[in-house]
Amino acid sequence: MTATATVIELTDKAVAQVRHLLGSTPGHRGLRLRIGVDPGGCSGYTYKLALVPGAETGDVVLPQDGFDVVVHTTGVDLLRGMRVDYTETLTSSGFTFANPNAKSSCGCGSSFGSSDDPERTAGRREAAANRSRRS
């Protein structure tokens, strides 16, 4: 396993798969792995992975074994301490995420909720208040 500046940890299998993807992508020289989150999914945020040509303004660049991982500063706190693995079974394969900041997640593992999400917290409070009014 390789630690990426203590923000994100990629397992050896994840590193090998990223290297494989980079090697099979035409013009792969200089590509980076972007890891991020977008609002959405059934739990609040969805994980996002992409091979990108370079870092953008506001990105944190995390050197990895043979490639760079880039994370936008707005996602760093949601991803800090996350472990990315690559798993293969007879029926599926893909990257998996173990995120200590995820307070809830969906069944597929692609979406998570965080206690730091003020809109979700406010929404839960409002829903609870509506339920108690109906009781």
UniProtKB/Swiss-Prot annotation:
Disulfide bonds: none annotated. GO terms for biological process: iron-sulfur cluster assembly. Residues 106-135 are annotated as: Disordered. Residues 117-128 have a biased composition (Basic and acidic residues). Coiled coil: none annotated. It comes from the Bacteria. Residues 106-115 have a biased composition (Low complexity). Pfam families: Fe-S_biosyn. InterPro entries: FeS_biogenesis, FeS_cluster_insertion, FeS_cluster_insertion_CS, HesB-like_dom_sf. GO terms for molecular function: 2 iron, 2 sulfur cluster binding; 4 iron, 4 sulfur cluster binding; iron ion binding. Belongs to the HesB/IscA family. This is Uncharacterized protein in nifB-nifU intergenic region.
